[in-house]
Amino acid sequence: MSSHNDLGRASELAARQHLERNGLRLIQQNWSCRRGELDLVMLDGDTVVFVEVRARRHSAWGGALESVDARKRGKLVMAAELFLQQNSRWARHPCRFDVVAISTEGATRLDWIKNAFDA
């Protein structure tokens, strides 16, 4: 297993634990479809939260948050739409997109950006 995959799994676990400590509940993890993947789908009160977890060891190519560009946001929105179509239980709930950015350059830092972008 590559260290890249290790970083991804560890980052998703850290993000999930952080969000659960802050009151969110897990609905689904690593949900995938032909349109893309949703790292975490969580519930914050009545709101369905689609969480993109981004981790970076080095900021040479930009930080974790900057890596969620317009193309990536579009894929996340399309995947979220399909998730809601296939999981009608959640379709009438309000939704938002959060990003958890983790940097391991120097001291590990986790930033949770609520409502990081609009659909």
Swiss-Prot record:
GO MF annotations in UniProt: nucleic acid binding
Family as reported in the entry's similarity comment? Belongs to the UPF0102 family.
What is the top-level taxon of the source organism?
Bacteria
What is an example of a Pfam family matching this protein? Answer: UPF0102
**Organism for this UniProt entry:** Ectopseudomonas mendocina (strain ymp) (Pseudomonas mendocina)
Please identify the protein, giving its name as recorded.
UPF0102 protein Pmen_0910
**By its UniProt entry, which CDD domains does this protein fall under?**
PoNe_Nuclease
Name the InterPro entries for this protein: Restrct_endonuc-II-like, tRNA_endonuc-like_dom_sf, UPF0102_YraN-like
